[in-house]
Amino acid sequence: NLYDLWTDFSLRHLPKTKDKKKLLELACGTGIQSVRFSQAGFDVTGLDLSADMLKIAEKRASSAKQKIDFIEGNMLNLSQAGKYDFVTCYSDSICYMQDEVEVGDVFKEVYNALNEDGVFIFDVHSTYQTDEVFPGYSYHENAEEFAMLWDTYEDAAPHSIVHELTFFVQEEDGSFSRHDEVHEERTYEVLTYDILLEQAGFKSFKLYADFEDKEPTETSARWFFVAQNVRAYDSYRYYCWVQSFS
């Protein structure tokens, strides 16, 4: 279960204490991860663009008897979202930004939303995943009341892909309705993310892969960045760390 993996990774890297537990989950969707964070003892706020998703999230939190605030909003503007000890952004949601300028803008918004020494964790597709694994990917599911077609293609920009999804859902009268979705994603080289994080103000960050506390390999599918907005740092050590990925 991916949500188990996201939760376990988060708990290893978010230093929650009695006085330090306010968490903002970006792109929270239907609130599955938000509920898990709340059950783990965090004071959770979930933010998402979709009002429909947030309605489901509110019902999910209520059913789980968890007090969670949900905000309809865009991660490109967190000026009204408040201040937090921790911010997370999972399920490669950063990859939905249009370009690296927007990625950098998100990082700046998160930095400003964090309390001092706050931690920001996000995951993105690796360039191996977008360049070698996804292009030509095809998945079809056919059940009695539901069918799904999922095809992925390489897009024009470097390290970018397009997911084309078609759903057929059986209605009460027995007929099937068709729903089409197109998802465009793009990732970047590790050094690009490093530079954008530094420009946003983050001076301390570490890189992991595939939900484990290990450095990425050439075939890692998902990169995890754990960034902290500490004010004082050893600039030489930071420079050497960044250079190790160049």
Name each model feature, range by range.
Residues 19-29:
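Conserved class I S-adenosyl-L-methionine
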Residues 79-86:
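A short acidic, Gly/Pro-enriched loop at the edge of an enzyme's catalytic core
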Residues 104-116:
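A short glycine-rich, Lys/Arg-flanked "PGG" loop and its adjoining helix->strand segment in the class I
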Residues 121-192:
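SAM-dependent methyltransferase
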Residues 90-92:
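Residues lining the SAM
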Residues 2-20:
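Conserved alpha-helix/loop element of class I SAM-dependent methyltransferases that forms part
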Residues 31-77:
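Class I SAM-dependent methyltransferase SAM/SAH-binding core
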Residues 184-241:
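C-terminal lobe and adjacent flexible extensions of AdoMet/dcAdoMet transferase-like proteins
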